[in-house]
Structures are given as C-alpha cells and as structure tokens.
C-alpha cells in the first residue's frame, strides 16, 4: 500500500514546501495559503462579474439559468444528438475552469498568483523547469521530483474551482456568487460556440463541459472553433478525430479512432465499457 501511494505522498510533501504548512494539513488549507498567503479574508478583494453583460440574454432566477432558449444547468453544459456519425472531430478546451477564473479575475489581486501556478505547471510539462522555478520562487534541480511538483500544482488548481462553488464557508467562496460563474461562463461560451458552428452549416452532436464533437469536420471548421475560443480566452486542442462514433445519449458512446498504424476503440459510459462487452464486440481482445 505504501508503494502504491508513495507518489501521492511525495506530491503532498511538495505541496507543504510550497505553502509552508505541514503535509498533514488539508488540501484546502494548502491551496488558500499558496494563493492568499496570510490574508484571512481575501473575499473583500474578490471580483464578481454579472455574466448577463458578457452574454446578453442570460438570466439567473431562483436557482435556474436560461440562455438563448435553453436551461443551461448549474454546472458544465451538456448537449447531445444521439446517432451514428463519421469523421468526428473532438476538440477540448485546455483547463476551462482555471481559464475562466483568470478571465473573470475572480480573486482580484490574488488571481495572478493562481495564474502563476497554472503557468508553472505548463512549463514543467514542457520541460522548462528553470522558468517554473522562478515563477514559484522555488529552487528546482536534478533532484527535484518534477512529477510530484506537477501533481502538487494540479491538486491546488483542481481544488480551487470546487471551493468557489461550495456551499460551506471557505476562503475561496464569494457569497455574491450564487450562479457559479466559473462553470457558467464556460457553459454560456459553449452555447454560443454551438450556435456559431451550426450557423456555418455543421452539425454539433455532443458537448460535455469543455469538449465539442463535430461530424464530417473540415480543417476550416476546426480552425474556426480554435479562433472562436481565443476570443473568450480559451485555447482548444484537437484531441483526435473519430473514424466513427455511436452516440447513445449525452453520457454514453463508443468510438473508433486511428492511433498511428492501428485502430483503437474508446468507450464512455458503463454499457460499452463493461469488459466483456468491450472485448467481445469491439477490441476483440482475448477474454480470460
């Protein structure tokens, strides 16, 4: 068990090194310390954005959000047109929620520190450890556990979004933020993107929070989506193109993609992911 969790413990120790707290302190305490320092009430400097000014027509009323004739939900936007499709481009927004926090300047003067953590993780991923060390004010050399450092930063970045929308009191919670504007900005953006792509004559068959799928995609529509995202501060990545995809509903699909010289099946949802079903019907792996 120790060896299985040793990587997590290494990340925990690096988290403590960044925050100055102990490895036994909670993730929430580490995150607050790293971003807000010793400020106990950072909320007084937070920025709350009325999204109806950025997205005219958006309404939040008695816990229900509507925009462009749709009920958006209070988390990520989900949309599907079940069916069988071919040549399906899959494009994902890189770090949607952290980017929304940056674009909203959610934490006011503390947003830069949050952005620095995000930048440092990208730099580590690309091997520029010297620049990452300068941003973090941390000495990094050949003995540094880079995976542990990256995991520690990921822990902070991932925990912060949940804390902004939590119903319990914490340093990241703004009482004005009733409509979860971090997730909502991404959702409203994806609705605008869906309409923009449809207006070009393409079909949008699936949207799941930060991902969009378009069948019979051309290089032109892929370039359009990437440029559309940049206008809102989002960077899209062309994750893959499915040779074919069977979409059952907004949470279940099976798809085949070309990976180098061979085809690879990818399943999402319990029905197709069941080992016997997946191996017997799709991957043709030996069933033991």
Region roles according to the model:
Residues 1-99, 176, 180, 185-219, ...:
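Conserved "right-hand" nucleotidyltransferase catalytic core of DNA-directed polymerases
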Residues 11-17, 51, 113-123, 253, ...:
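Generic hydrophobic, helix-prone segments enriched in Leu/Val/Ile
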Residues 27, 128-129, 145, 283-286:
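Alpha-helix capping and helix-coil boundary motifs
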Residues 42-167:
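Catalytic nucleotidyl-transfer cores of nucleotide-processing enzymes
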Residues 78-85, 123, 131-144, 167-181, ...:
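Glycine- and acidic
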Residues 88-89, 110-113, 145-149, 174, ...:
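Catalytic cores of large soluble enzymes that bind and process phosphate-bearing ligands
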Residues 150-194:
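Signature for HUH/AEP ssDNA processing cores
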Residues 215-288:
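C-terminal polymerase-core module
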């Amino acid at each position: 068990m120790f060896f299985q969790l040793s990587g997590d413990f290494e990340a925990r120790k690096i988290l403590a090194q960044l925050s100055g707290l102990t490895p036994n302190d909670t993730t929430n305490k580490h995150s607050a310390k790293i971003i807000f320092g010793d400020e106990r009430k950072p909320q007084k400097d937070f920025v709350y954005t009325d999204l109806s000014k950025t997205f005219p027509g958006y309404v939040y009323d008695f816990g229900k959000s509507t925009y462009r004739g749709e009920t958006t939900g209070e988390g990520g936007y989900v949309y599907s047109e079940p069916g069988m499709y071919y040549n399906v481009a899959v494009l994902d927004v890189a770090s949607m929620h952290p980017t929304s926090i940056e674009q909203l300047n959610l934490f006011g003067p503390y947003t830069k520190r949050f952005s620095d953590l995000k930048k440092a993780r990208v730099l580590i991923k690309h091997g520029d450890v010297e620049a990452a060390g300068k941003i973090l004010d941390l000495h990094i050399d050949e003995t540094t556990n880079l995976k542990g450092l990256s995991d520690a930063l990921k822990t902070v970045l991932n925990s912060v979004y949940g804390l902004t929308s939590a119903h319990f009191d914490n340093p990241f919670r703004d009482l004005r933020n009733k409509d979860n504007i971090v997730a909502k900005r991404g959702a409203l953006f994806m609705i605008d993107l869906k309409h923009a792509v449809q207006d070009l004559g393409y079909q949008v068959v699936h949207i799941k929070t930060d991902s969009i799928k378009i069948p019979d995609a051309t290089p032109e529509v892929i370039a359009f989506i990437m440029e559309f995202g940049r206008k809102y501060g989002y960077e899209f990545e062309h994750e893959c193109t499915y040779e074919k995809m069977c979409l059952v509903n907004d949470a279940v699909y099976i798809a085949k993609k070309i990976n180098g010289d061979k085809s690879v099946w990818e399943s999402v949802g319990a029905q197709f992911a069941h080992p016997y079903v997946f191996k017997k019907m799709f991957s043709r792996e030996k069933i033991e």
